[in-house]
């Protein structure tokens, strides 16, 4: 895992003048803004549309010498609308959208005129530890004034942390107060590139606002490509067609999204599992165009080199037990069993572990379907499936087996719609002991449950031959 852009590129982007529009017209940026999910709260709260953006709101930004391109990106990736446009304030400070906008622009001028320290903490998060102590402030102090970095660096922890405290972010993944957020600087840079701008020199790449990454080429789209596009569209729609669950306090979430409540607005971020699922869906669509789709597109250590399943479980069980108290991968239960399967059979089912991936053949999102959603046959495993209306059997249990629990199970897991998963450590006639992650946001823990209750929740097992 590495930064998406180089340190030099991030710094060049943040050193751009805060009034730089990157050669994009008000209409181009207004049209982009209206199509962004993160703009919906502002659109709904203040009645914003492309027309009044161009006629009313953007001229106000220009009056204050603030780039409409940068300001509207800031709004989108903060999910503004709870506290004015950019969510600097907890609640709206004006009676309408224009007043709220003007107060945000006045805040930006205040940041330019008064020193505010770089943000490396937030109310809901632990402070981040820099990779190179003091490097962020040294860069911040070196800026000539009225740059975009002068606005962003004292205002948002997330981008600063991922650029200047990268190792902290990688090693402290999880729900708040850990690192639950992505990098808004990446999102801003990506958006500028998509609109045809050069984030690092401040100009336009194409000069006509077209996406530089889209070639002209052959405009003919094959029927198979169109079919794959429709499959991907449907899969993405299904992926996001789930409710957010109330986790605690102001926090909500599901396996796709994390959300924190600001007044009446939920600020949402894509989870690593959500991103992983999207990447896998895209990979699967690409796989369907492979002339030999039956051949796995990932490589793993040869199974003969790994020894028998029981030997591999025995060799790795102590390692798994040593992870108790730690967050693995993105902190989800899915990542934990992905980490385990990679060590025992050479393949993972979670991108967040950084291991070779099994091919996806079905449901790659829900923990209750892990045994059916991935092509375990290439990993020399055994699959036990318990159809709806049946319960697990004690005689099927194996040390090191991955178990899958049903959605909305009640005791002992009280699962939501995604179910749950973990690793069997041991069992007796009356109890079972498992290693699991993300019980109410927990790291890897050891839990002991009533055996019959545990068996009643099972949808399947994955054992290692």
Curated annotation (Swiss-Prot):
InterPro entries: CHAP_dom (IPR007921), PlyCA_N (IPR048974). Residues 213-226, 289-307 have a biased composition (Polar residues). Residues 308-465 form the Peptidase C51 domain. Keywords: Antimicrobial, Cytolysis, Host cell lysis by virus, Hydrolase, Viral release from host cell. Gene3D superfamilies: 3.90.1720.60. It is an enzyme of class 3 (hydrolase). Changing residue 87 to A: Almost complete loss of glycosyl hydrolase activity. The keyword Hydrolase applies. Residues 2-205 are annotated as: Glycosidase activity. It catalyses: Hydrolyzes the link between N-acetylmuramoyl residues and L-amino acid residues in certain cell-wall glycopeptides. The active site is at residues 333, 420. Part of the PlyC holoenzyme, which is composed of 1 PlyCA and 8 PlyCB assembled as a ring. Part of plyC operon, which contains plyCA, lil and plyCB genes. Component of the endolysin PlyC that degrades the host peptidoglycans and participates with the holin protein in the sequential events which lead to the programmed host cell lysis releasing the mature viral particles. Once the holin has permeabilized the host cell membrane, the endolysin can reach the periplasm and breaking down the peptidoglycan layer. When associated with the small subunit PlyCB, the large subunit PlyCA displays 2 catalytic activities, amidase and glycosyl hydrolase. Cleaves the amide bond between N-acetyl muramic acid and L-alanine in the host peptidoglycan. This is Endolysin PlyC, large catalytic subunit. It comes from Streptococcus phage C1.
